[in-house]
């Protein structure tokens, strides 16, 4: 692993692999954010003590 010039320290991933992993992480965070916003809107709409 240390001999491969394409691998980036310390993860051992290539730049392309790291970018792919980061894209998945960002996409997952966006999905989580949308679900969280939707849950907060529904909680506000359906709980009378928040009005």
Curated annotation (Swiss-Prot):
Residues 47-51 are periplasmic. It is a single-pass type II membrane protein. It is found in: Cell inner membrane. A bacteriochlorophyll binds at residue 40. GO terms for molecular function: bacteriochlorophyll binding; electron transporter, transferring electrons within the cyclic electron transport pathway of photosynthesis activity; metal ion binding. GO terms for biological process: photosynthesis, light reaction. GO terms for cellular component: plasma membrane; plasma membrane light-harvesting complex. Its main location: membrane. The keyword Magnesium applies. Residues 2-23 are cytoplasmic. The chain crosses the membrane at residues 24-46. InterPro entries: Antenna_a/b, Antenna_beta_CS, Antenna_beta_dom_sf, LHB-1/5, Light-harvesting_complex. Keywords: Antenna complex, Bacteriochlorophyll, Cell inner membrane, Cell membrane, Chlorophyll, Chromophore, Light-harvesting polypeptide, Magnesium, Membrane, Metal-binding, Transmembrane, Transmembrane helix. Antenna complexes are light-harvesting systems, which transfer the excitation energy to the reaction centers. Belongs to the antenna complex beta subunit family. An alpha/beta heterodimer conjugated to 3 bacteriochlorophyll molecules. The core complex is formed by different alpha and beta chains, binding bacteriochlorophyll molecules, and arranged most probably in tetrameric structures disposed around the reaction center. The non-pigmented gamma chains may constitute additional components. This is Light-harvesting protein B-800/850 beta chain. The gene is pucB.
